[in-house]
Amino acid sequence: MNNLTAIVLAGGQSSRMGQDKALITVQGVPLLQFVCNIAASCADTVYIVTPWPERYEHLFLPGCKFLPEAATQGPLIGFAQGLAEVKSEWVLLLACDLPKLRVEVLQEWAANLDSVPEEAIAALPHHAKGWEPLCGFYRRRCLPQLLEFIHQGGRSFQQWLQHHSVQVLSLPTPEILFNCNTPEDLAVIQGEFDDLSPNPSPTRRGA
């Protein structure tokens, strides 16, 4: 899929985590850097929408551009701000706290965007709680409807999406949508990665 733009949202308060989720490291890599590097493997341009670009300037983010957010007003408004900069037909929207995100899944989804019905404004995974709005694709032309919804006081992705046609993306493994919202979530993901690490070589007798 050519001419794809990505938007990564890094404007949350991280109140439940107690620290900036974007800077939490998993296997030594900050989450924002991890997500942006995957986004850059799928998209020509990656925008990072955040009120605090200075927090993240030290990260290794090749090909990424910061879009300073005026204030933390929620992901829907952050997305609208980023979408206003997009020139491509499709945009990949990602949260910054997806430690199990897999580039091959995103690339497969992107490769099939040409088959999404014309009336659909988005292509997203769906689960028991509804749409997963922060790991999927949107058509640029949805911006006017999005702005109208926001101007009417809307702030919920779920409420906005229920008024529009959305294509369901097949989810090969639900775990890629796992996000780190709490210290308990972080402990789970770090424990799983630790379990995947190779065991240290046993010390030889007499060494």
Swiss-Prot record:
Keywords: Cytoplasm, GTP-binding, Magnesium, Metal-binding, Molybdenum cofactor biosynthesis, Nucleotide-binding, Transferase. Its main location: cytoplasm. Mg(2+) binds at D97. One of its GO terms (molecular function) is metal ion binding. Coiled coil: none annotated. Its cofactor is Mg(2+). GO terms for biological process: Mo-molybdopterin cofactor biosynthetic process. Pfam families: NTP_transf_3 (PF12804). GO terms for cellular component: cytoplasm. It catalyses: Mo-molybdopterin + GTP + H(+) = Mo-molybdopterin guanine dinucleotide + diphosphate. Its EC number is 2.7.7.77. GTP binds at L9, A10, G11, K21, D97. Belongs to the MobA family. Transfers a GMP moiety from GTP to Mo-molybdopterin (Mo-MPT) cofactor (Moco or molybdenum cofactor) to form Mo-molybdopterin guanine dinucleotide (Mo-MGD) cofactor. HAMAP family: MobA. This is Probable molybdenum cofactor guanylyltransferase.
